Amino acid sequence: MHRFLEATAGQYMTRKVKTVARDTTMRELHKMFEADDFNCYPVREGDDIVGVVSHFDFLKCFAFNPVRMVPAYDDLLSRMVADVMTPEFIYVDPATKLTRVLQLMVDHRMKSVPVLDAEHRLAGIIAREDIMRALTDSARG
């Protein structure tokens, strides 16, 4: 267990991360979610990460109350990621201990957390599966 206590996000994160642009359509995002086994994508504007978009953000587009008219499906899929993304997002840096990452995931019910370097550039992403791998590695000693 001691190994897990010392492990960092940088040691277990996925370094090659797929991102989406702010002007990606919901239709394109839907195809990406179908093709990949990801819960969320960092949203980029140039080299900067300006938010995240998750399955939950995508699904919120389709939640309506009886007072609102339901827009056409094609109209919803034509919306841009910028319209539904979460611009205020939680992230960690590569030196963040996995114990802290795990606590953030539990507290905020997150499946993955972007990892940004000192210049706030995307360094990777760490998912629940990465935490599980670290725990398994630690148990093996």
PLM region spans:
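Tandem CBS (Bateman) regulatory domains
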Residues: 1-16, 54-90, 97, 102-106, ...
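A short helix-to-beta-strand capping loop
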Residues: 14, 37-38
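Short, flexible active-site loop motifs that bind/organize anionic cofactors or intermediates
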Residues: 16-19, 48, 91, 121
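The conserved cystathionine-beta-synthase
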Residues: 20-37, 43-44, 91-109, 116, ...
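A glycine-centered beta-loop-beta connector
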Residues: 33, 41-57, 105, 113-130
